[in-house]
Design a protein with these regions (language model features):
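Domain-level signature for soluble enzymes in the chorismate/prephenate branch of the shikimate pathway
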Residues: 1-98
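Glycine-rich, proline-tolerant flexible connector loops at the mouths of alpha/beta enzymes
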Residues: 34-43, 151-169, 326-336
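Alpha-helix-loop-beta-strand connector modules within alpha/beta enzyme cores
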Residues: 44-58, 165-188, 222-228, 277-292, ...
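N-terminal amphipathic alpha-helix/helix-capping segment at the start of soluble metabolic enzymes
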Residues: 88-122, 356-360
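Hydrophobic faces of well-ordered beta-strands that scaffold small-molecule active sites
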Residues: 119-125, 148-152, 186-189, 206-208, ...
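Glycine-enriched alpha-helix->loop->beta-strand junction motifs that scaffold or abut catalytic
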Residues: 146, 198-207, 223-229, 250-256, ...
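N-terminal active-site wall of soluble small-molecule enzyme domains
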Residues: 152, 156-203, 207, 215-218
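Conserved anion-binding
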Residues: 156-158, 212-278
């Protein structure tokens, strides 16, 4: 019997490769099942101790050309890839990552659709101060042919305990009354579970501020409230953490969630925060939930709103949030980053959301 030639040996290798691949695929199916079971039990996916046990057992097997070192190298690579498979399975199991979670028409808030293909403006003062102030802003917003939600804070979580904290229920009432007069839907922040029913009674969309992104009890309660939620990214949060916060809401029954990039904290001081523009397309790849950008809090300055707004829309943002005040220099909170009414008109014109008078 003649010795096998190179072609035959290579054919044998090809068969073995396919057999190994089949067994690796079989192993991967078991790995995914383990990952799902661990997730259901609240256990960490990665178990270094279990890996070491398997390596010890494998090193005791009779070997040929593969010694203990080679076996360790091969199986450590398999473990590393398997961990990636488990992590992908964990992520894919999240409701926020499921395709078709949001209808093609977007999330309806009043007569506005967020994520429906047309950028929406979330505009209004940082804080509701009085009826006259809010009326001037709302009346101006209503004159512009741009899909708009009226934002305004009634409960203000301030860094300084001596700063203006908001008008609370009176502010909610003013916001609702003013919005109704001008056929606008409202967005305002809810701070905790205790005030959630009150805020939900008055407002069309409930905002979770950056400070509350990790407030799991509030997130779970918002999942049961039945109203659209605007979820802001905390300034130190990863995008994965933002999606997991959204998962708390969605997994509790409310898939009407809009994500908001509002800037992250870095060493840079030229802006109030650092606008993570890459967050927009990444989130759009990871989830079907709409994504907007809060320009005012990300930048903390008025002079670069237009170019950054253009960048956000070009990146795929479904809307922009901008703080607008009739007299920013007299504002009771964050006056330095709010823009006046003519500046707001110029902004939406510059963004191409509405044509300036006299232009074709």
């Amino acid at each position: 019997m003649s010795a096998p030639d190179l072609k035959e040996l290579r054919a044998g290798i090809d068969r073995l490769n396919l057999e190994i691949l089949d067994r690796l695929q079989e192993r991967a199916d078991v790995v995914v099942a383990i990952a799902r079971l661990k997730q259901a039990q609240g256990l960490d996916v990665h178990d270094p101790g279990r890996e070491e046990e398997m390596l010890q057992a494998l090193s005791k097997r009779p070997t040929g050309a593969f010694g203990t070192f080679e076996i360790g190298e091969v199986f450590r690579a398999i473990f590393r890839v398997s961990l990636g498979v488990q992590e992908k399975a964990r992520k894919d199991a999240l409701k926020v990552r499921q395709k078709g979670l949001i209808a093609p028409g977007g999330i309806r808030v009043g007569n506005v659709a967020v994520g429906g293909g047309v950028p929406v403006m979330f505009a209004g003062p940082c804080a509701v101060e009085n009826e006259e102030q809010l009326e001037r802003v709302a009346a101006h917003l209503a004159t512009l042919p741009v899909p708009t939600l009226l934002r305004g804070g009634a409960f203000k979580p301030r860094t300084n305990p001596y700063s203006f904290q908001g008008l609370r229920e009176e502010g909610l009432r003013l916001l609702q009354d003013c919005a109704r007069r001008h056929d606008l839907a409202t967005v305002t922040e809810v701070l905790d579970v205790a005030t959630l029913p009150l805020v939900a009674e008055y407002c069309d969309m409930l905002q979770v501020g950056a400070r509350n992104m990790y407030n799991t009890e509030l997130l779970k309660a918002l999942g049961k409230i039945g109203k659209p939620v605007l979820l802001k990214r905390a300034f130190s949060a990863t995008l994965e953490e933002l999606l997991l916060s959204a998962e708390y809401i969605v997994s509790n029954g409310n898939d009407r969630v809009v994500l908001c990039e509002r800037g992250i904290r870095t060493f840079e001081r030229a802006t109030r925060n650092t606008l993570d523009i890459s967050a927009v397309p990444i989130l759009k790849l990871e989830t079907s939930l709409p994504v907007i950008v809060d320009l005012s809090h990300a930048l903390g300055r008025r002079d670069i709103l237009l170019p950054c707004g253009r960048a956000a829309i070009a990146a795929g943002a479904d809307g922009l949030m901008v703080e607008v005040h009739a007299a920013p220099n007299l504002a009771l909170s964050d006056g330095f980053q709010q823009i006046d009414l003519p500046s707001y008109t110029a902004l939406v014109e510059g963004l191409g959301l509405v044509r300036a008078p006299g232009r074709a």
